[in-house]
């Protein structure tokens, strides 16, 4: 046994966070710590890592056992390069090696000196215990696995990004090889290949691993036990997260059955007491039942965190089949190309996941697709009848006021009961509906935005990293809601469980190139990508006469005119939408009607423009193909 917890408890003033927690950690345990946000997982970690020393009960670590914890803000030496920072983990070993070299020179002069031999053995043990002779091999292995290419090893630590610093801290901790490795959300800031490397590394780790994570894919691949922190206590389950779910369901069913039996017995005893206490002949028996009732401890009913949210995304308006059309779409920021010319069509009811390494431009691409940012070239077109809703990474659009006001101001015809019932489906119950929006956590802001989207009834969803800030149970609820959604979905995510559950194509964006893969497994195996219709890169050959050249010039001019007018219409569309949502227009029925009519006419004209543009492009492509076949 490496760690033992016995009746552990922790309170902050009158608030009890943990109570009567008992568990143990054995060598080679792989323990996933799960629970709702705020359940006490962080408090438990701070006790385990010695941050909190004031607690009830017993927490003991076996003598000689080392604990390693990934501190998010652990200091690194900004004067070193990446490789030098990794070597600094071996400072005692490097010191022992240097001392051994000096010692060996002395031993050469005095080979029979027993004290020198004894000191040599001590230094040798220090080096062997840390696998010092394989130091550089292990450093290179871990750096490569954690996503640091060899040409970056000389990069100064002081210029690394936040994500790179987090990966470097984790790499150093892995090298130190503590007996118990304690990790808090280790897959944050990691790309898919690095996640898989880390999973394989941890599965073969010689010590024990405790990890707090909301990443179900990771918990399923690595963990052999689950610690569920819930309602001030903790329960241990055998197996990975998928194995934990049915065990929890069975345990909750048994607990509910016992709770119901206890309540029924209490009611039966109380009924007997009420009927017989006043009768002289049955007073003693009633008093006996009263003592029995006073001693009865009613089993607490289970609280099901895994299924607390009840929401679905539904829509009313059926759009055109070709719903999101990308034509030679190009995105640049300054001199950097995020997306080279790319053509693709998302049809009604289809799903498309956008993935790629950090900084590849996924969120920028999503902003172009949902109309928040203009492309550098080409175009994005939403089909007729599209009713989009947008979930951005930063929920800045939710302003001040209370939670209940966010919904009520937008839907004033709803009664208070209707608003509160709706918010309850997204986890806002009781007094939490009156909580100020500025006091909400990231997870609460996300749930509030989901509450808005449900009422918007969109047939097209643009979601940018919607699982960020969500606990694992809310992620499960969101996954179920998206799987049940029959509208069109464009989704940026790094959640591998969500990706596999949706079982849809993945647009992988890297180094300016977009490639479509049929699934996550195909992406990781780098299987042949799904075919995507794109224009030939071979230039058209000119073999026409004068009339054909004239017509091609007309088509180019028409396409350019359509694109210019569509861009102007798009800008006006954004202006009108902003005006319609402003209080000045929203509260003026006549003005609102005028603006709405103008927007409707504008969108009809956009459809006409797009039809003309599409016909011209198709005719132009026919000329190009004909020209290519002339030679």
Per-range role (PLM):
Residues 1-257, 308, 312-631:
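ABC ATP-binding cassette signature C-motif
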């Amino acid at each position: 046994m490496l760690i033992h917890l016995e009746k552990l408890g922790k309170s902050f003033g009158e608030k009890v966070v943990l109570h009567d927690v008992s568990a143990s950690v054995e060598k080679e345990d792989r323990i996933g710590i799960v629970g709702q946000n705020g359940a006490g997982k962080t408090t438990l970690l701070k006790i385990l890592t010695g941050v909190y020393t004031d607690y009830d009960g017993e927490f003991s670590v076996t003598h000689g056992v080392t604990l390693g914890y990934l501190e998010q803000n652990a200091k690194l030496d900004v004067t070193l390069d990446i490789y030098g920072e990794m070597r600094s983990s071996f400072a005692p070993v490097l010191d022992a090696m240097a001392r051994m070299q000096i010692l060996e020179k002395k031993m050469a002069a005095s080979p029979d000196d027993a004290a020198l031999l004894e000191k040599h053995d001590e230094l040798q043990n220090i080096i062997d215990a840390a696998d010092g002779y394989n130091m550089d091999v292990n450093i290179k292995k871990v750096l490569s696995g954690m996503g640091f290419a060899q040409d970056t090893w000389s990069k100064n630590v002081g210029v690394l990004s936040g994500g790179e610093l987090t990966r470097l801290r984790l790499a150093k901790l892995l090298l130190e090889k503590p007996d118990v490795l304690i990790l808090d959300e280790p897959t944050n800031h990691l790309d898919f290949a690095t996640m898989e490397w880390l999973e394989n590394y941890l599965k073969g780790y010689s010590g024990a691993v405790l990890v707090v994570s909301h990443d179900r894919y990771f918990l399923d691949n690595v963990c052999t036990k689950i610690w569920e922190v819930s309602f001030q206590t903790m329960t241990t389950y055998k197996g990975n997260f998928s194995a934990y779910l049915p065990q929890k369901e069975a345990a909750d069913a048994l607990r509910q059955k016992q709770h119901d039996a206890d309540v029924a017995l209490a009611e039966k005893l109380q009924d007997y007491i009420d009927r017989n206490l006043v009768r002289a002949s049955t007073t003693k028996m009633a008093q006996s039942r009263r003592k029995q009732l006073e001693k009865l401890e009613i089993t607490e009913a289970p609280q099901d965190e895994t299924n607390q949210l009840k929401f679905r995304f539904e829509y009313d308006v059926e759009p055109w089949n070709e719903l999101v059309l990308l034509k030679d779409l190009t995105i640049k920021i300054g001199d950097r190309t995020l997306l080279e010319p790319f053509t693709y069509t998302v049809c009604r009811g289809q799903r498309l996941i956008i993935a790629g390494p950090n900084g590849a431009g996924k969120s920028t691409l999503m902003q172009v697709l949902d109309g928040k940012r203009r492309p550098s070239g080409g175009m994005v077109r939403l089909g007729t009848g599209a009713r989009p809703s947008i979930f951005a990474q930063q929920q800045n659009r939710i302003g001040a006021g209370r939670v209940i006001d966010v919904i009520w101001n937008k839907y004033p015809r709803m009664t208070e009961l209707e608003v509160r019932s709706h918010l309850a489906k997204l986890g806002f119950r009781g007094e939490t509906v009156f909580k100020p929006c500025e006091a909400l956590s990231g997870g609460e802001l996300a749930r509030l935005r989901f509450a808005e989207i449900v009422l918007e009834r969109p047939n097209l969803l643009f979601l940018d990293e919607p699982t960020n800030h969500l606990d694992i149970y809310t992620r499960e609820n969101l996954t179920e809601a998206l799987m049940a959604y029959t509208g069109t979905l464009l989704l940026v995510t790094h959640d591998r469980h969500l990706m596999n559950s949706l079982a849809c194509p993945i647009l992988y964006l890297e180094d300016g190139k977009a490639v479509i893969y049929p699934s996550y497994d195909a992406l990781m195996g780098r299987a042949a990508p799904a075919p995507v219709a794109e224009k030939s890169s071979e230039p058209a050959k000119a073999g026409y006469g004068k009339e054909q050249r004239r017509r091609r010039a007309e088509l180019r001019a028409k396409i350019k005119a359509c694109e210019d007018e569509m861009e102007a219409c798009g800008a006006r569309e954004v202006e009108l939408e902003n005006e319609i949502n402003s209080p000045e227009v929203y509260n003026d029925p006549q003005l609102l009607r005028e603006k709405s009519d103008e927007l409707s006419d504008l969108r009809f004209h956009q459809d006409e423009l797009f039809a003309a543009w599409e016909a011209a492009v198709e005719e132009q492509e026919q000329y190009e193909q004909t020209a290519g076949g002339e030679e």
